[in-house]
Amino acid sequence: MGLFLYLLFMIVVGAFIGGMTNSLAIKMLFRPYRPIYIAGKRLPFTPGLIPKRREELAEQLGRMVVEHLLTAEGLRRKLNDPSFVQDMTSYVQEEVEKWLQSDRTVEQWLKQFGMPDPKQTAETWIETKYKTFMSQYRQRPLHEIIPIDVLHKIDHAIPSIVDRLLLRLRTYIESEQGERQIEHMINEFLQSRGMFGNMLQMFLGNVSLAEKIRPEIVKFLQSEGAKQLLVQLFINEWEKVKEMRIHEVEQIIDQEKIVVWVKRLTASIVQEPLQKPLGALVAPYVRHSLPTLVRFLLQFASERIERWMKQLHLQDIVREEVASFSVERLEEMILTISRREFKMITYLGALLGGIIGLIQGCITFFVQM
């Protein structure tokens, strides 16, 4: 009975010492948080290991994250992974679809992004561009401003324009309205000539002068000479127009009228799209091009991920974040992860201490015999 109690006592003492030693060693990883001084001398093992090595720990964690955990190659593999590309495409499509279903108009979206009056902004922009254009080209002739191909098209279009004009004139003159108009003009002309006009009307009697003149006018309009005359007239006038300087055109039309006309044109063009839901305007194009756009962006990111990571200085970010943690927070984080393992270490120390106590008790007992 005495031997059993003696050995039990040695086991308990050994287990207590072993458990307390390991528990104290674990606590000394974190505590004390700050160095302790007595008579101006720092006590050994103060502060604890982690508070003492916090800067070094932060540096090593930052290096470990960049070199072994969050590497450019690992991110590149993830970005190029077909399943990840498909997941990202599906996610973006879902989010964009929500946006496309929105009833918010283009004007509302523009206002949200800092454009309080899109219509006025467009008008102001057009007016500014007009004034800038005029300040640069006011002294230059039209033929230097209008594109060459447009000038050539107008040059070649003059004969066809003349043909259409002559056709319209012949059609009008051959109509009843044209006949009445010619007769009215002849009567006004004869009346303006006084006695000579009256004598001419008496000489003609009941014969209508308009009926005699109208066929000759039609005949003239059908002649090649009339066409060549008008073509040459149009060409001469067009050459004069091409030589006109921009400021001359501006004076003829009036600058203010041009600006007002441009603003009205802008308003008529811009107003309708501004009142439509943005989703309805862009939905067909977005849905069609979205998968290609997602793949392009992921490929773009994959090719530049290493450069971006260097520019982000991830190692410094991790180091600064860890260094900014209080020792209490570091202790809490590590214990949250490893509390069970630390307990097992304490229990292991108690177990080893108990075994050592048992062995020591047995040796002592046999030595004393």
From Swiss-Prot:
What domain of life does the UniProt record list for this protein's source?
A: Bacteria
Q: Write out the GO cellular component annotations.
A: plasma membrane
Per the UniProt entry, the disulfide pairs are none
Q: State the annotated membrane topology for this chain.
A: Multi-pass membrane protein
Q: Which UniProt keywords apply?
A: Cell membrane, Membrane, Transmembrane, Transmembrane helix
One Pfam annotation reads: DUF445
Q: What's the family?
A: Belongs to the UPF0754 family.
Name of this protein: UPF0754 membrane protein Aflv_2299
